[in-house]
């Protein structure tokens, strides 16, 4: 059952990717389409492409709540690739836009601990 769900979910993320790319062809400045395309790419383990979409959206988005979500997702990608200093900055930027986001605050604390552990293991 789980495997079947996984295949179904994956096909939905592929369809979403196609649809959001079409939306961006119609309106290349749509930060909602960039963000949602980034999310669909992320769910397909296409982190590099997802990051490109989030970076593009972060340059034009004005809404603080949406910016917080964008930077949060950038932090998640950077954390998963162990780029802790950049990850920490992304989470801090997310919190500047939405200081009440407990999930981002937790992720920031975790990333700071992981960076400290990484630095201790190198010395």
Describe each region flagged by the PLM.
Residues 7-11, 28-31, 47-48, 63-65:
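Short, mixed-charge, low-aromatic patches
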């Amino acid at each position: 059952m789980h495997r079947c769900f996984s295949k179904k979910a994956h096909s939905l993320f592929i369809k979403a990717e196609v649809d959001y790319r079409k939306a961006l062809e119609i309106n290349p400045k749509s930060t909602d389409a960039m963000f949602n395309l980034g999310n669909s790419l992320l769910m397909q383990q296409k982190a590099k492409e997802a990051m490109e979409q989030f970076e593009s959206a972060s340059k034009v988005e004005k809404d603080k709540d949406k910016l917080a979500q964008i930077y949060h997702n950038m932090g998640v990608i950077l954390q998963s690739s162990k780029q802790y200093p950049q990850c920490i900055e992304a989470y801090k930027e997310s919190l500047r836009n939405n200081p009440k986001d407990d999930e981002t605050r937790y992720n920031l604390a975790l990333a700071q601990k992981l960076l400290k552990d990484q630095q201790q293991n190198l010395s």
